[in-house]
């Protein structure tokens, strides 16, 4: 039914949690256009050594867009415009984003039958305006900060986001906690569809094989953490937790993959706590190379202060690894049994350390974790999204 249809995706990124489902959904469409918001200010992060610009560096094109193995019928187009993500100034991003998208649609003669906008602002605003102008159905997905933080940042934002929600034909979100917030904002019939993982990229790898491939020591208790080195990820608490664990379990080795504006500060903390042998910063790694790091580890650990529904949690489960983390966003919906991981409140390094120590010495059932994870493969999640698309295009 959809093979003669074109899908327009509006997003703020084109990497894992957007890229993976889009490329599965694309098999059912004639053409998929993905218009990715890009702020040219993000390119200054490596040039101007000021905190504001360094914080924006993670949104530069090289991190924002991943074209690896992109299908031929998916066209990814950066939509560049300047905006300031600061309080009510960020409201101006909506109309600016819309103007740029309209110019791109006209310039490239883009034809579409359905719109799927990811994030309520500013992509959601653009989707709502396009839906009105072209009389096309709009699917809107709320992910994280755009749901639990942005609407409450000011009365103007509350009104703007409520207006966007009113114009969507179908609203999706990634966790039940988000659904409750959206209901309070006036959204009706919100469908919860969690994020997922790519079966092609994340799967069980024998530990010995992974250790050998990565040249990692066999006599260490290796745990993995992946994420931007930013305040919201709570890495200072994880580093302090590793210090506590190392006193009882000197063989612990936490490997961090990623980068961010707090890198220098967090490296200094590791040095100050004298745990350079227990906490290593590996920098960024390609998404398709992460499976071996999961394979080499005992489990995955997160210290996030807030989340929507972290993709890395599903990737961990998809590799047969338990998830040790914090009770934020949709995480407790997924890690709903001690068979799949252990959770604590954020900002509590002592309980996090206790959970890490327990996890090191617990006998985990890898097969049970793998079996549980299958429902969260992007293939399964996308079946539900396709059903929604088909109903809207009838």
Regions found by a protein language model. Name each.
Residues 322-325:
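Short hydrophobic beta-strand element within catalytic cores of glycosyltransferases
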Residues 183-184, 197-213:
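Acidic anion/phosphate-binding donor-loop and adjacent secondary structure
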Residues 337-338, 342-349, 358-363:
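Conserved acidic donor-binding segment of nucleotide-sugar-dependent glycosyltransferases
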Residues 267-285:
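Nucleotide-activated donor-binding/catalytic signature segment of Leloir-type glycosyltransferases, i.e.
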Residues 305:
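Aromatic "clamp/platform" in nucleotide-sugar-dependent glycosyltransferases that forms part
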Residues 177, 196:
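Carbohydrate-associated surface elements
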Residues 172, 217-233, 239-242, 255:
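Conserved donor-binding/catalytic core segment of Leloir-type glycosyltransferases
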Residues 284-285, 292-297:
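Short alpha-helical donor nucleotide-sugar binding micro-motif in glycosyltransferases
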